[in-house]
């Protein structure tokens, strides 16, 4: 949640893009709820400057709660309290905006030696879907790392990372044999796009530490995953779960 939200200026000039409302709650709340629904209750949010509103949203406001209770506005009280009871939330600023890989690397101390999930705030997944639960199960079974994949029209693949895959007999997940960041339609290995959900083995941290800046001078998570996918030993291997449900891109005004 450390991006600048430039595509939604001027609305995001003084308010984080993650706090833009989707129906009756900010976009970031849907993402946190998705994590909690998948059994994840220790959540670290990587933020940036001018993003204090994210912390405030998930904090309690006793005066507001008392006022709603006294006014008999029980439905509103319940909706306010829901955001403050979603799990154990922690916050860490990214500092230098050096890309997604750098943001993930900032979580190293908090995560330690455990597999962990990365959920990008730009992607909202229908709450009726069990994508993250399926990804966690695939990670536990393979011992590697798992990315979420979604079919897109080939002419749109240049907006995503594209995956080369091969089937795994008897399993619903696939083996990812290669990743290409934002390829042209002609160079893309498939029309399977990487979307903003990852379940990663902690070995990714040591790979990220050795990953040089790539496109745009940023540390690309895709580059590190490519390296880890071709490695051997504990934590090696890259797999994908193909998502066929509804996804909304909060970074796209027309999504």
Identify the residue ranges that each predicted region occupies:
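Catalytic-core segments of class I nucleotidyltransferases/pyrophosphorylases
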Residues: 117, 136-140, 167-255
